[in-house]
């Protein structure tokens, strides 16, 4: 489990890395490869997230960010209005999300995600909320953790999510960050999605601490 990759003495820090020690990964290898907001599968997700880069690969390894206030503004007015009254269902287990794939690097993946589903059943969050500091309307949904829309039949909910997620390809709401060793990046987890963009392979190493 991810608890195997917490930094010694600092349990709030998770190690993200493809480096190996005695043939085993020292961190979560394929963390965050789908667009997501950290821990949105919890009832009270964190307000912010911080990444500290310790080792960068020679190629790739960037992190993408999406502005979810701008994403909401991209939607047609009719869709904006419809989403105001809906709640999305968020879940950490990949077993209930057809949009994601289970990494080959995850040991005993099926058992792990079955246990996660048992420990962390789906929770609901508004599809759109008003940011408490800026007053902006924020689209709060992601391909990684949003598995359905409450009150809609499965097919209708998935179709609506597909329509929303298609807007995530718009370059005007996206920024890709290229890391240098020692960089620290922090962001508002409530209004920004992020994902690891890959593009490197072992023995090219990426090592990042997340909290």
Language-model features: locations:
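Fe(II)/2-oxoglutarate oxygenase catalytic core
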Residues: 1-186, 190-211
């Amino acid at each position: 489990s991810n608890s195997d990759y917490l930094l010694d003495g600092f349990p709030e820090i998770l190690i993200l890395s493809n480096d190996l020690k005695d043939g085993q990964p020292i961190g979560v290898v394929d963390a965050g490869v789908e667009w997501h907001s950290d821990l949105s599968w919890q009832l009270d997700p964190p307000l912010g997230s911080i990444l500290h880069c310790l080792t960068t690969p020679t190629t790739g390894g960037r992190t993408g960010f999406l502005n979810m206030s701008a994403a909401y503004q991209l939607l047609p007015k009719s869709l904006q209005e419809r989403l105001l009254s809906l709640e999305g269902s968020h879940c950490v287990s990949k077993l209930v999300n057809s949009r994601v794939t289970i990494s080959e690097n995850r040991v005993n993946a099926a058992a792990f995600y079955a246990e996660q589903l048992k420990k962390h059943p789906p929770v609901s969050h508004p599809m759109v909320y008003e940011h408490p500091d800026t007053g902006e309307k924020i689209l709060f949904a992601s391909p990684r953790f949003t598995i359905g829309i409450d009150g809609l039949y499965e097919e209708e909910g998935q179709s609506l999510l597909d329509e929303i997620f298609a807007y995530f390809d718009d370059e005007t709401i996206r920024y890709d960050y290229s890391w240098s060793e020692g960089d620290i990046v922090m962001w508002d987890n409530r209004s920004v999605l992020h994902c690891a963009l890959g593009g490197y392979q072992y023995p090219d190493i990426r090592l990042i601490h997340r909290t």
